[in-house]
């Protein structure tokens, strides 16, 4: 099958550090190529892939200090795709809704994975207008605000089976990995660690929009002797960070669409303490891969008993549910359905 993957340009595919969407696009693309499909990846020029790469920008836009208007690069990339859309059996978009006016008018089968939160009022009229656009959710919880969208299915993220190795013996610290932002609540993670008496290591990026939150809420807590902020991590450094952790703290305060770090932790054998929001009940298995909580008191109690969980079971759940092979199998089912429907509509 000839497949186009159209990625955001904010990060490279895969990203050097933080970047959940681009990371998933990379895993999906590489597994499709491994299975023999003809894949073209539209992404930033510093992306690394075994697919055919069509650069939409010279490098990832977040790391390009000279880039002022990121949207301009995305529009040019979409026009580039449109000019060769007939070369593909299926086009898979990961750029939110930017392409909807274009894809509504093209004949190539297409589907869009929605990677972000959908409980934003501004999205309601947009999805009423573009209710014909075929979309995929990354959790069932994510799609709840848009029940009437043209859902083709839910496909949970998956990562390569051998990307992270199993770490049977934990270290002596809690891990927090992600973005420093109000909805990720690293301040909660610090308080949990303080009450339990276990050190916390924070590996996270800080976007410009979150600098005020960092300065006002998080930075005053960093001098605590049990807190270590190490910045962004990637690759083997990330595996070591997660795999050696006593547990991953995921104290979110928003309707998390998926939470990629949870399955990355599972792949290492590291259990999770997560607030029961958004996708968390779909991704985690209570009393097996960790504990779900609703408040600080429950989080502290969970942290005190997390050592009783099997790290091997965490790894097993990852292998059973969250590999790239399973993700590709699910997407191929959707691609096939879209292509067949398009052929039937064209009278083929």
Task: Write out the residue ranges for each language-model feature.
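Catalytic cores of nucleotide-sugar-dependent glycosyltransferases that transfer UDP/GDP/TDP-activated
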Residues: 1-348
């Amino acid at each position: 099958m000839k497949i186009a993957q159209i990625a955001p340009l904010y990060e490279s595919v895969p990203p050097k550090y933080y970047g959940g969407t681009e990371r998933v696009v990379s895993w999906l693309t590489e597994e499709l190529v491994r299975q023999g499909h003809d894949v073209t990846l539209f992404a930033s020029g510093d992306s690394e892939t075994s697919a055919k790469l069509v650069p939409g920008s010279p490098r990832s836009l977040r790391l390009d200090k000279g880039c002022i208007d990121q949207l301009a690069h995305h529009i040019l990339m979409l026009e580039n795709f449109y000019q060769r859309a007939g070369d593909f059996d299926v086009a898979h978009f990961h750029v939110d809704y930017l392409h909807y006016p274009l894809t509504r008018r093209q004949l190539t089968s297409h589907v869009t994975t929605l990677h972000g939160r959908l409980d934003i009022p501004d999205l309601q009229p947009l999805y009423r207008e573009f209710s014909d656009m075929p979309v995929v959710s990354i959790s069932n919880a994510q799609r709840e605000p848009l029940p009437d969208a043209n859902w083709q299915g839910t496909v949970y993220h998956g990562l390569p089976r051998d990307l992270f190795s199993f770490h049977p013996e934990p270290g002596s610290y809690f891990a927090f990995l992600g973005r420093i932002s109000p909805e990720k609540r690293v301040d909660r993670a610090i308080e949990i660690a303080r009450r339990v008496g276990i050190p916390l290591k924070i590996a996270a990026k800080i976007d410009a929009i979150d600098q005020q939150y960092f300065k006002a809420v998080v930075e005053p807590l960093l001098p605590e002797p049990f807190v270590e902020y190490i910045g962004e991590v990637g690759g083997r450094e990330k595996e070591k960070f997660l795999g050696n952790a006593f547990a991953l703290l995921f104290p979110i305060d928003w309707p998390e669409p998926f939470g990629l770090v949870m399955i990355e932790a599972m792949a290492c054998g590291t259990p999770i303490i997560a607030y029961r929001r958004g996708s968390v009940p779909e991704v985690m298995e209570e009393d097996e891969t960790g504990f779900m909580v609703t408040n600080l008191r429950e989080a502290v109690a969970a942290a005190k008993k997390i050592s009783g969980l099997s790290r091997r079971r965490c790894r097993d759940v990852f292998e059973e549910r969250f590999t790239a092979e399973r993700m590709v199998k699910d997407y191929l089912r959707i691609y096939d359905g879209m292509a067949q429907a398009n052929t039937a509509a064209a009278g083929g």
